[in-house]
C-alpha cells in the first residue's frame, strides 16, 4: 500500500530525514515513535506531499507521491491526515466542517454529503454535536470531528500525527477508541504517537526513529520486551517510566 524508498529531506542545513525506507501493507497499522526532532512528523507530511522530498520516492496505492505531476487533490483524498491541532474551521459547524471537502473537491451532492457526514459523526460517537461549532466542543470531540472529516473523503490510508498530544488526559481514550475501531475495520494507518499502550495493543509493527533514520522496527511484543538497539532501549525506558511511573520494565505496558 505504501512504499517509501530512500527518501531524504532537509530544512536548510538541518537534515531531517536521511535515506529512509519503509513499506506498509494494506490493512497494517504502523506506529512511529522516537524522540522529538527524530523526523517522524516530517515523514508523515512527505507521505501526502505536504512536504516535498529531495531524493527518493514514495508510492501509495500505485500513485507516485513524489511525481511533481501528481494531482494533489486526488492524492490527498486517498491519504487522510489528522494533526495534533484539530484545524477545524471555527465559523463552521461540525457537520459543515465534514461536508466541505466532499462537496467542493469531489462534487458530492450536498444532501448526500450531509447524510454521509452524519453517519461518520455517529461512527465517532458525537452525532448529537452535528450543529455545534468547534468552540462548543471539547478537545476530544474536536479531534473526533477532524477524524470524521478525513474519513469523509474515503481515504485508503490514514495518517495520525500525535493526535492526542494536545488533549487533556481524560479525553485521550475517546480518540484512541475511534482509532482502534478504524484499525480493526482494516484501515491502513501510520500513527505518530507516544501512547505506548495503544501501540502495543493495536499496532502490527512499531518503528523507532532517531536522527532522521529508522533505528529499529518490530512487532510490538518483541519491540517492547527485547529491543536490540541501545537508543531504542533508552527511549523506551524513559517513555514507559513517564507513562507508568510505578514500573520500569520494558515489557510492562498493558
Task: Give, region by region, the residue ranges found by the protein language model.
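ABC family nucleotide-binding domain
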Residues: 1-220
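C-terminal boundary and immediately downstream tail of ABC-type ATPase nucleotide-binding domains
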Residues: 221-254
Amino acid at each position: 500500500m505504501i512504499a517509501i524508498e530512500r527518501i531524504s529531506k532537509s530544512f536548510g542545513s538541518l537534515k531531517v530525514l536521511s535515506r529512509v525506507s519503509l513499506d506498509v501493507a494494506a490493512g497494517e497499522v504502523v506506529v512511529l515513535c522516537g524522540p522529538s526532532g527524530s523526523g517522524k512528523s516530517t515523514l508523515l507530511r512527505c507521505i501526502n506531499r505536504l512536504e516535498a522530498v529531495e531524493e527518493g520516492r514514495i508510492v501509495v496505492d500505485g500513485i507516485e507521491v513524489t511525481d511533481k505531476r501528481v494531482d494533489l487533490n486526488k492524492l490527498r483524498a486517498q491519504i487522510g491526515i489528522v494533526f495534533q491541532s484539530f484545524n477545524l474551521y471555527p465559523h463552521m459547524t461540525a457537520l459543515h466542517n465534514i461536508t466541505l471537502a466532499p462537496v467542493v473537491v469531489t462534487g458530492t451532492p450536498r444532501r448526500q454529503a450531509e447524510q454521509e457526514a452524519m453517519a461518520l459523526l455517529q461512527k465517532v460517537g458525537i452525532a448529537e454535536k452535528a450543529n455545534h461549532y468547534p468552540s462548543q466542543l471539547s478537545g476530544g470531540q474536536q479531534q473526533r470531528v477532524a477524524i470524521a472529516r478525513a474519513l469523509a473523503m474515503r481515504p485508503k490510508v490514514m495518517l495520525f500525527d500525535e493526535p492526542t498530544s494536545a488533549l487533556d488526559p481524560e479525553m485521550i481514550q475517546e480518540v484512541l477508541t475511534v482509532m482502534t475501531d478504524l484499525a480493526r475495520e482494516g484501515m491502513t494507518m501510520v500513527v505518530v504517537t507516544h501512547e505506548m499502550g495503544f501501540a502495543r495493543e493495536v499496532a502490527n509493527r512499531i518503528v523507532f526513529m532517531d536522527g532522521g533514520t529508522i533505528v529499529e522496527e518490530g512487532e510490538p511484543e518483541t519491540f517492547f520486551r527485547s529491543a536490540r538497539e541501545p537508543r531504542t532501549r533508552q527511549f523506551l525506558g524513559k517513555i514507559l517510566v513517564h507513562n507508568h511511573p510505578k514500573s520500569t520494565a520494558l515489557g510492562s505496558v498493558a
